[in-house]
Amino acid sequence: MKPAMETAAEENTEQSQERKVNSRAEMEIGRYHWMYPGSKNHQYRPVPNLGDRAGPLSSPGCFECCIKCLGGVPYASLVATILCFSGVALFCGCGHVALAGTVAILEQHFSTNTSDHALLSEVIQLMQYVIYGIASFFFLYGIILLAEGFYTTSAVKELHGEFKTTACGRCISGMFVFLTYVLGVAWLGVFGFSAVPVFMFYNIWSTCEVIKSPQSNGTSGVEQICVDVRQYGIIPWNAFPGKICGSALENICNTNEFYMSYHLFIVACAGAGATVIALIHFLMILSSNWAYLKDASKMQAYQDIKAKEEQELQDIQSRSKEQLNSYT
């Protein structure tokens, strides 16, 4: 009997509050008619809210949709993707042209016999084909990592409803972590390898600067300042001439092939370094995303168990209330 009495009391309280609100509104309308007699036939019309007026820029949900879309953009992955694309493009483009210029310099000045540098020409041609493959692979791989960043960001921030992820998705994220780590180590080797031609061209350029210096002009020792490319191992020791000295070496340094190849090798080395930084950035992002997915999946499992227990508790309480009402 007690619950029924409490319910009746609550209903009486609500009805009294509604009567107070209605009487207050009627008093306000009566006061308005008393102050303005000509408005007795006027019917009270509520003023529409500004939010009720739908416009092209204030459509319901438009602003929230834009905020949700911007919130789902993985900005860290986007920056890493742009850096990776830029580094790979610089390395592949500049490296390809610089290798072609290096072959031209060797054929014209250091190895006039084609058979002496035939192996080097084949290796450089193979490296140019490898550059094509590297550019294609990293273009695709960068897009895949960016898509994985969108997936992880949407899953963690619950942008499309409740948190949803699968064991396969977490396994794919872990696989990307391992693959990015391997590629990062490989690109460290590429970065070190790309510094070798920069070192070689720098030695030739510094030797030319010594020849051009005022202390060396007019002396007989200028013709004794030489550069022997055979000591770097890129052409065999029986290659002719293999060694260039004096004014001939200065003429090589003044050619467009040498100038372009030297600076393009520097840019290619910088591009390889940028790619290494981008892969390290990707590795940090993928590791954190994988950890977030793992923790979020555990939290989701805990919330599911908790919701199930609360539902069972509510069912028990509802059944106990029904039994109590049946007894009363």
Swiss-Prot record:
Residues linked to a glycan: 113, 217
UniProt topology in membrane: Multi-pass membrane protein
Biological process terms in GO annotation: extracellular matrix assembly; negative regulation of protein localization to cell surface; negative regulation of serotonin uptake; ossification; positive regulation of bone mineralization; protein transport; regulation of actin cytoskeleton organization; regulation of focal adhesion assembly
Alphabetical list of InterPro entries matching this protein: Myelin_PLP, Myelin_PLP_CS
UniProt note on tissues of expression: Widely expressed. In the brain, expressed in neurons and oligodendrocytes.
Cellular component terms per the entry's GO annotation: membrane raft; plasma membrane
Cell location: Membrane; Cell membrane
Chain residue ranges for the region called Disordered: 1-22
Chain segments annotated as transmembrane: 71-91, 130-150, 176-196, 265-285
PROSITE patterns (UniProt xref): MYELIN_PLP_1, MYELIN_PLP_2
Presence of keyword Transferase: no
SMART domains, A to Z: PLP
Modified residues (Phosphoserine): 318, 320, 326
Pfam name, any one: Myelin_PLP
Lineage: superkingdom: Eukaryota
Quaternary structure, from the entry: Interacts with SERT.
Protein family per UniProt: Belongs to the myelin proteolipid protein family.
Main function: May be involved in neural development. Involved in regulation of osteoblast function and bone formation. Involved in matrix vesicle release by osteoblasts; this function seems to involve maintenance of the actin cytoskeleton. May be involved in cellular trafficking of SERT and thereby in regulation of serotonin uptake.
Name this protein carries in UniProt: Neuronal membrane glycoprotein M6-b
Organism: Mus musculus
